């Protein structure tokens, strides 16, 4: 027989063999399914006897799981004959395990009565851990936020609001007051001189856009024509695109020691958002939430004395507080979830319409989500997720901006009030600002697919592929013949910008569990990740129109355009081994190796090692009985922060010379040795529970040092470059502590009382600048990054002539003096929840201490002659008194540095759950009515409207100044949530 003939026979035999095997498998599959049974269980709260919804029941060692419905019932079908352990868990409760046995197609039943717990060592988490693992095995600190619990307490508008004061070490505060405005979101302080301080955010394993600053000036167009901020310092926040009602929980990795496996973008921590999923063996379960209410600024604008004065034409000056309105709010969400034996679904749709307290300003947002899962076999799970968002914002003009609406109203002089400028506006009439049209329109699709393969109970594989695609358009229109600057009347302008952003995520994680010895288990994780981000900005501006009614850029007499593009790619590999010594001691060792397109050409891959240990002492018999849980832990790890996409490149900027002849000039000098900033963090702490876990106490201390921090080094003029060269020569120390106490003070019958106390402190210091001399005072060795400095007063003379030509006057030092850090060094929050029967009351109070800010509004307002602290000292005829002259001349010489310390009633609510007997004929499930307030009242000494204001948006590094910004409003809501 020829070789070809022999090969044909072998192929034929192989085909027959595999065909028979496939046929037998297909024939056996129905028989196997015929021998499967069902597990049915009920889950209740041991303290109240009420059913627990959304608890997860898992057949240990398999992928078979289900979630409980509103009656606390779960059904798991397709369970093969045998003996199993069923594990039931829910955030806020101690998990329970029960044994069941199935013979053939029997039905096994189990009942679970869960106990509320202030400590959750057995809670399963997945972010940064190399696979799903109980918290008892982790040696670093992690925060988990249960969105269902948050929404039962208060109606939230966005995810940033939901995270505020919920996790120690996480700062989430509103820095602007308009609808859709950004928040400052950061974890454990500051670890860089110039790079973004926002944590990396993932949604169901997919990296997403979190931009929270204006994006227009990146095109370089501003040197061609007066352009091109759209809303001044006010910025939108892409995290606001998310629908809080779609979220199940949020996991927060607080620092480098915990986030090592995320590599070169994880220095600032990692936030992973998990959206809701369907339920196996569940008929369609509908949820409906409707919320109405309003936003209203606190009437504490410092212009209450304005109406006491009249202008030169007899116009009575207006108080800026008269601009405050009730901004209506409405939000509607509907969702359905369910599934069969091997498939589940969750789908939702939402619509929000929010108007600002200062008009014109609104946000209109529509969301749609579809999450599907399918188990084609017992070994494969396929999950698909998709979110579509359309978000339109009429932006408020605010923040270091000639056309800032409140800024013009508050910084006027009431003695200059006219019919056109009733606030005595120094720059732009408020009436003209209200005619401006500033919009942000974003369309966003975020989705992905995850494949889970479990060839054996001890061997799992997970592959995730996802995309975040954001298309954003911004526009600003100045109508013809309005006054939009100190120069007077303009002939109109239109700014138009487009931003296209996408982020691809590809992630693989394998995990193999095996026994080294009888009581020593190894959980070996391995995998890789590829990320690619791209951002393109296109800007056009048209200036000077022929007349009213013209608004197209192309119709303007003067036009200009600009474009910017950036792309960054990361590929990383990881390996980790977690050793379990019985149920008491766990040790983890791991490493991530990264390559990044932003690394210098002379720099290769970066290695990030980690190690942690967790010791559960409460498993030992010698522990006192009142200590129900006790884990001590320690961790050390590295994470990085990659440079900007083009920082390593030598670049040139195009210029027109010699009457339009194109040319180039040197721009960025580049650096082929540029490498990531690297933070090494050491952390230690404990988690403990007392009295059957009714009292939970957790504490952590951490010390982090950032090396290779990027510093801009000025080059000699002979080098010919316009900008400084980025070099890795800096070092920053960042250290702090965190503590929390959760106490189920009363859990008896109809009455419950739960209290939560969270405390944290943080300090940072510049250690080294590598000999580089920086301009300004914000970065100084031995002081905090972006510390606040000022020129102090050195003398006072009652007869010396000041800036207004009158006495008294002051003298100041020529040397800057350190005033304080820009971020709080101490944060605290105290939350209390009281429940009596179907009635629940909740309140959350927060405190911030230790920070200062540049209160530029205060001296500026005085120099304009319109600050209440100046007006109160004027004589009855309007002439300045000696005290008024003193105030005026002081603030003509000095900048104001004021305290950011404040105590705030951040959240308060009253909820009522309608008794089931009233709903029996309506087919409705659990129905709750909630009246709530956010940002209700605060106490401060800042001589400002709100100490948290920041004119430059939510991620504006190094800015601690509320100049012309708008404060966050009070928010009042009435919500109803029901299921059917």
Residue ranges, per PLM feature:
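N-terminal periplasmic "start-of-domain" segments of outer-membrane beta-barrel proteins
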Residues: 56, 60-71, 125-156, 180-184, ...
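Extracytoplasmic beta-strand/coil segments of soluble accessory domains associated
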Residues: 161-220, 248-254, 259-278
